[in-house]
Design a protein with these regions (language model features):
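N-terminal accessory targeting/assembly segments
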Residues: 1-113, 425-426, 430-432
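Conserved G1/Walker A P-loop phosphate-binding module
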Residues: 4-10, 149-289
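Conserved beta-strand segments of the P-loop GTPase G domain that flank and frequently precede/overlap
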Residues: 14-18, 49-52, 84-86, 292-295, ...
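Conserved nucleotide-binding/hydrolysis micro-motifs of P-loop NTPases
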Residues: 18-22, 54-56, 88-91, 110-113, ...
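Flexible beta-alpha connector loops of hexameric P-loop NTPases
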Residues: 21-27, 57-61, 119-124, 169, ...
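Conserved C-terminal guanine-recognition region of P-loop GTPase G domains, centered on the G4
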Residues: 30-41, 72-77, 87-103, 253-256, ...
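Canonical P-loop GTPase G-domain recognition
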Residues: 100-158, 165, 318-324, 328-379, ...
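Long, well-ordered amphipathic alpha-helical subdomains in the mid-to-C-terminal portions
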Residues: 366-413, 431
């Protein structure tokens, strides 16, 4: 029997340019390590790393002719099948580098898009990734058909200025892709409408929404599982969760909330993805509370927290109340940093350490006066029972001399049934 054929993995050389003019897009040792982890997530293996310091990028080759020759030799020596840059490349730079290096060339954006395409499971997630891919592909189409344009068509005998099949195909592809982009945007607009309807229903029922945000692989899905008993896959790999998952969580005797797990953020997150995932990420704008999960065991946790903070601001969610959840505290040595404060909670989502305190903090931050009360309705006021079923959480109803009801009621309901609730006293600000 023949041995099972091993899966063929791309051998990848990573290239990064560190330049002051690139600012946040500049490559560092830390960002190159993260790029290597992204390659692993995508199913490849890192065969080598080249990090160059240069005052300004070369307009044609990004890293300069000399460095290109060095990378080409490196690729040949290690037998690499792909080169991935930690920076964003222009379509023309990517095309030139592919020709000079003789292997496929991607930039960080293209790699992340590939990972997202592998990970998206729901229709909504796939639509959003497809939109981002088409927007990334559109300016790169010219390179795909340049060989036909140079030939002047398949025969190579077209007259100067003639419109060969290569150019025709380019225009056709552009029209097709723009048409697909319009269709996907229309589909995503329908997703937005559905989400808006769901939000209105939650607001009508006064169910608070808690959104879990954080850097990729910080432990967001593990926290959702720990809080709600859900069975969301939570693996130790980047971008394991792309599709928003929402679960109902009972925080206390008087409060239920909807908890949503969102796509993880990362440094240099492609703007195409931020734009494409707005249908999902805009849920943050309507959350009542954000849980910013931070992997405190990661040496780069402060920088990762800053990346998330900037994206929260970009998405218009910076005014929403927030609890910083310092996760993986079980991996921090005794005596090392374990932050505490009014808006900080140290936990281990894996073991459950600190989660009870987190629930208490959520309860306090979202407490809007909801109370569990016993109501004694006279039978001639039975119509109020229908209102309670609509606007409160009725737990039990018994019929005796009165209609005896146990319900969890928001403040506006308490104001309507206060005369029949002997164990509830309105707050002083409501007294006349």
């Amino acid at each position: 029997m023949l041995p099972k054929k091993e899966e063929i993995r791309d051998k990848v050389v990573l290239v990064g340019l560190n330049s002051p003019v690139l600012r946040e897009d500049s490559a560092t040792e830390e960002s190159m390590d993260e790029l290597s982890a992204l390659v692993e997530t995508a199913g490849g293996e890192t065969a080598g790393i080249v990090l160059q310091n240069r005052a300004t990028p070369d307009p044609r080759t990004f890293i300069g002719e000399g460095k290109v020759a060095e990378v080409q030799l490196y690729v040949e020596n290690v037998g690499a099948t792909m080169v991935i840059f930690d920076n964003d490349l222009s379509p023309s730079q990517q095309r030139v580098l592919t020709e000079l290096l003789g292997v496929q060339v991607l930039d960080r954006c293209g790699l992340i898009l590939d990972i997202f395409a592998q990970r998206a499971k729901t229709k909504e997630g796939r639509l959003q990734v497809e939109l981002a891919q088409y927007r990334y592909l559109l300016p790169r189409l010219i390179g795909m058909w340049s060989h036909l344009e140079r030939q002047g068509g398949t025969s190579g005998k077209g007259p100067i200025g003639s419109k060969g099949p290569g150019e025709t195909q380019l225009e056709t592809d552009r029209r097709l892709i723009n048409k697909k982009i319009d269709k996907i945007r229309a589909d995503l607009e329908e997703v937005r409408r559905v989400r808006a309807t769901q939000r209105q229903q939650r607001q009508k029922n006064e169910i608070p929404v808690v959104a879990i945000v954080g850097y990729t692989n910080a432990g967001k899905s593990t926290l959702l599982n720990q809080l709600t008993g859900a069975a969301i896959p939570a693996n130790n790999r980047l971008f394991d969760t792309l599709d928003t998952t929402s679960r109902l969580l009972t925080v206390s005797d008087t409060m239920d909330v909807v908890v949503s797990d969102t796509v993880g953020f990362i440094r240099k997150l492609p703007h195409q993805l931020v734009e494409a995932f707005k249908a999902t990420l805009e849920e943050l704008e309507y959350a009542d509370l954000l849980l910013h999960v931070i992997d405190v065991s990661n040496p780069e946790w402060q920088h990762q927290a800053e990346v998330v903070e900037k994206l929260i601001v970009e998405l218009g969610a910076n005014e929403i109340p927030r609890i910083d959840v310092f996760n993986k505290c079980d991996r921090v040595e005794a005596g090392d940093l374990r932050p505490h404060g009014a808006d900080i909670c140290s936990i281990s989502a894996r073991t459950g350490e600190g989660v009870d305190r987190l629930l208490e903090m959520i309860d306090r931050r979202l407490d809007k006066g909801t109370r569990r009360v016993t109501i004694h309705l006279p039978y001639d006021k039975g119509g109020l029972l229908d209102m309670l079923y609509r606007e409160a959480k009725v737990e039990s109803v018994e019929y005796s001399e009165t209609i005896d009801i146990v319900a969890v009621c928001p403040p506006k309901v308490l104001g309507q049934i206060g005369d029949y609730t002997p164990d509830w006293t309105p707050p002083k600000e409501d007294w006349e």
